[in-house]
Amino acid sequence: MSQSLKERLRNLSVEDRIGELEKPQDRQLLKEWKQSGVRFAAASGELEKVYYKALRRLFDCIAPTGGSEPILQEGGVYLGCWLESTGTINAELLSRFLPSVSEATYLSFAKHQREDGLLPYKITEQGPVFKQIQLVTPLARSVWNHYGLHGRDESFLRTMYEAMSRYDQWLATYRDTRGTGCVEAFSTFDTGHDLSPRFWHVPDTPHLNDPAAYNRDSPILPFLAPDLTANVYCQRMYLALMAEKLGETSGAMDQKLWREKAGQSLDSLFRYCFDEADHFFYDRDANDAFVRVQSDVLLRVMACEVGDREFFDTMLRRYLLNTRKFFARFPFTSIALDDPRFNPFSSYNSWAGPSNFLSMIRAPHAFEHHHRYVELTWAFYPILSALNRATRFPQTLDPWTGQEGFTEAYSPSILCLLDYVERLCGIMPRPDGELWFTGLVPYDIDMGGEIAGETAYCRMVNGDLYELYNTKSGSEICRNGRTIMTFPRGVRVVTDYGGGLLSIIGMSARPVQGAMQYEGRSIPFTVQGNEILNYKQGRFSRKQDIGIVYPAYS
């Protein structure tokens, strides 16, 4: 391995790289970041420089908001914390780096919950705001993952569980006026789909800014919304896990009852919002007609763990990896590319076509839930290539050129960079007690330039400092300065938190052949893309081999 790359990582000062701090609380944020041990270095290209620029801008997105504790803000022109994004998927990613900020962000929504159970759709300097619902990523999933990553604090879990239970009741009471079991959209902003043709001829906000009311003079409202319904389905599945963990055994807090409610939501989703011919989820309007706009609703529903792997693979072939649909050069578009209503312009807040960074950070869970690891990297490479030339960290990208679009210092794009680097070539802790060491490097799809060349990454886990080096000759894992594993590039090594080898995963479209050097043994293997090989007693054995779903063009 390159000694110079090791020296570069080990001598790297995060403090020096991010420069002068501006806010009083930034000093504490830097201290917490350094406690995570996370550092990233690259042998060439601009990605290392952009990485620390992103970290510096991340601190700008953290400030007291509606209370005394610093919480995550959306950033850019969005001065506040939104439940659909900042308070869920953004905070879920941030939890691996600055857990105290994520926890404060989650708790701020519980703190500001209305007496009737409604959670604010956003929190600003002026306090909580309730005029719409605005749901996408299930809050319960984000909370559950934070709980698993950081000490399993049952006091935190109970506070959030009770708040989310009350919110579930509010949605069932006020957002099922048609009695279908679906969750209804009363306005565009209920789903955060600004300017999407999905909501043409629908008001931006609920009637008179009352989240429990819709315009009864509308010829098409309310919509039975697949993304809102899928959110509640997934939410209820995670609430069942929480109820079981908290020992709740009766009444509304019974985990069996939560699973029954989740099943009802799933049944309603498929009965009312799924079109079998198109194999797609659509809103159903008040006249019982499908709103046939193919949008990123699909990715949202998939990220809510709806359907089995075969179902998801069909979605990949027909839509998510289809270059006529959502698999643009810089994926994923917010409207299908072959829809005549598709509008690629990214210079303003739009869900009418451009690739939004919120879609990019929601995507990994949808893919990884079904072990589609290789296919996910095909989104990582172009997006990191675009971010490699980032100057502003925008909300949107032009899906054809990757040029930066609307706004700047936007926390989803900042967190996208941190997350994609860790998933592609870093060390990622999982709430189930696994560590992922991924032996890939960013690949520049633009003009043949180099983004990073060889990479180095480190992270502190339970008092041990782990390092991962990805070079042209292969990959190396160190613990507390000592090499514990070497292996060929193109695989992901899965260990426990103590560094004990559990399995490897093929991360390339090509078969990877070579040997793992571990505990004094040279262990030969050949692993296909997405194949998982378990390790036991000095040997690898196949756990699963699901093959690869390839891009489609028609």
Predicted features and spans:
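Active-site acid/base region of carbohydrate-active enzymes
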Residues: 37, 41-53, 96, 114, ...
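Aromatic-rich carbohydrate-recognition surfaces in CAZymes
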Residues: 79-106, 111-196, 229, 353-367, ...
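Structural helix-adjacent loops and short alpha-helical linkers that scaffold large soluble proteins
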Residues: 39-48, 94-106, 147-165, 178-179, ...
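The feature captures the catalytic groove of carbohydrate-active enzymes
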Residues: 1-22, 121-138, 169-256, 290-292, ...
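Long, well-ordered core segments of solenoidal/helical folds
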Residues: 4, 9, 54-66, 97-120, ...
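C-terminal capping/lid segments that line or modulate ligand- or cofactor-binding pockets
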Residues: 81, 132-135, 139-149, 280-319, ...
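Low-complexity, Ser/Thr/Pro/Gly-enriched N-terminal "stalk/linker" regions
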Residues: 1-80, 104, 205, 268, ...
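Catalytic cores of carbohydrate-active enzymes
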Residues: 45-50, 172-187, 224, 231-311, ...
